[in-house]
Amino acid sequence: MSLFDWFANRQKTEPKVQQQQEREIADGLWTKCPNCGVLAYTKDLLANQLVCLDCGHHNRVESEERIRQLVDANTWNCLDEQIRPTDPLKFRDRKSYSDRLRETQEKTGLTDAVRTGTGTIDGLPLALGVMDFRFMGGSMGSVVGEKLCRLTEQATDESLPLVIICASGGARMQEGMLSLMQMAKISGALNRHREAKLLYIPVLTNPTTGGVTASFAMLGDIIIAEPKATIGFAGKRVIEQTLREKLPEGFQTSEYLLKHGFVDAIVPRTHLKKTLAQLISLHQPFFPLLSPLNSHHHYGQPELIPLKTAQGQTTV
C-alpha cells in the first residue's frame, strides 16, 4: 500500500468526532499571513498588534482592537453610540438596505462603520475616531458623518487634538447624496477645529479610498499612513480605462504618496501610539525645554516656553 493510500484510508476510517475536535482545537489558534503565507500563533500576532512577525504585513484591525492598542487603559469614553442609520431612500439592490444594515450590525456588533470617543494616549487627552472596514467596507454614510462631525465639534469645544483612523471604501452608495453631503459636513467641522489652532492627525490605513480620501483623510495638519496601505480615490482599473494610459506600479500605496508629498510620514503600527503621543505633546500650548549636557542632550527640569500667537501676543 502506498503512503498516499494509507493516509486516504485513515482519513476515511477516522472517527468524525475526533476530526471535529481537532478542527475545534485548531480554529483561531493559528493565523496565516495573506502576504507571505507564514502561519503565526494568533496570541503572538495580537501581541505584535496584528503585524506579521515574518514579513511585517499589517493585517486589518477591528475598531475595538485599535482602540485598545492606542488608548490608555480605563480612559476610553465612547460617544454617540445611540445614533443608528436609517433607510430614507428605501434603497434596494439584491436586498434592501435595511436588511443589509441589520445583518451587518448582528455580525459585527457595531451600529455603523465608525467608533468615536475621548481618552488619553500616554497621559495626553485626545478625541479619537476609528473606522471599521468590517461594516459595509467602512463606507461613509450619514451616521459616520454625524458621529465624526460631533466628535470634531467636541474636540473644538474642549480644545482637544483630534485623531481619525481611516479605513474605508468611500461614500456609501445606498445613501446617495446623503452620503456625499458628509464630505462637506465633516470638512466644515475640521475647518473650525483648525481655526481654533488645534491639531488634527488622520492615520491612513489599508484601504483608504473614495470620498473619505477626497475629504477628511487628506485635511490633516500631519498626515500619517501605515506601511503599504492602499490610498486613492478611484480604483486603478477605472482610472486606466478613463485616461487610457498605463499607471505606474504601486502608485496608490502609502510609499508612493510619501515620495510625492501627499503624506508626511509612514509609521509602523507598533510605533503608532508613541508617535502620536510625541506629536500631540509637541503641539501642546507648552512643552518642556531640554537643556544641553556635554553639548548634546540633557533631560533637565522642564521649563515653559513662551509662544507667540498669530496676533503677536505672547503666551506661556
Swiss-Prot record:
Zn(2+) binds at residues 33, 36, 52, 55. Keywords: ATP-binding, Cytoplasm, Fatty acid biosynthesis, Fatty acid metabolism, Lipid biosynthesis, Lipid metabolism, Metal-binding, Nucleotide-binding, Transferase, Zinc, Zinc-finger. GO terms for molecular function: acetyl-CoA carboxylase activity; ATP binding; carboxyl- or carbamoyltransferase activity; zinc ion binding. InterPro entries: AcCoA_carboxyl_beta (IPR034733), Acetyl_CoA_COase_Trfase_b_su (IPR000438), ClpP/crotonase-like_dom_sf (IPR029045), COA_CT_N (IPR011762), Znf-ACC (IPR041010). It is found in: Cytoplasm. Pathway: Lipid metabolism; malonyl-CoA biosynthesis; malonyl-CoA from acetyl-CoA: step 1/1. It catalyses: N(6)-carboxybiotinyl-L-lysyl-[protein] + acetyl-CoA = N(6)-biotinyl-L-lysyl-[protein] + malonyl-CoA. Its EC number is 2.1.3.15. It holds the Pfam family Zn_ribbon_ACC. Binds 1 zinc ion per subunit. GO terms for biological process: fatty acid biosynthetic process; malonyl-CoA biosynthetic process. Its cofactor is Zn(2+). Residues 29-298 form the CoA carboxyltransferase N-terminal domain. It is an enzyme of class 2 (transferase). A zinc finger (C4-type) spans 33-55. GO terms for cellular component: acetyl-CoA carboxylase complex. Its main location: cytoplasm. Gene3D superfamilies: 2-enoyl-CoA Hydratase, Chain A, domain 1. Acetyl-CoA carboxylase is a heterohexamer composed of biotin carboxyl carrier protein (AccB), biotin carboxylase (AccC) and two subunits each of ACCase subunit alpha (AccA) and ACCase subunit beta (AccD). Component of the acetyl coenzyme A carboxylase (ACC) complex. Biotin carboxylase (BC) catalyzes the carboxylation of biotin on its carrier protein (BCCP) and then the CO(2) group is transferred by the transcarboxylase to acetyl-CoA to form malonyl-CoA. Belongs to the AccD/PCCB family. This is Acetyl-coenzyme A carboxylase carboxyl transferase subunit beta. It comes from Microcystis aeruginosa (strain NIES-843 / IAM M-2473).
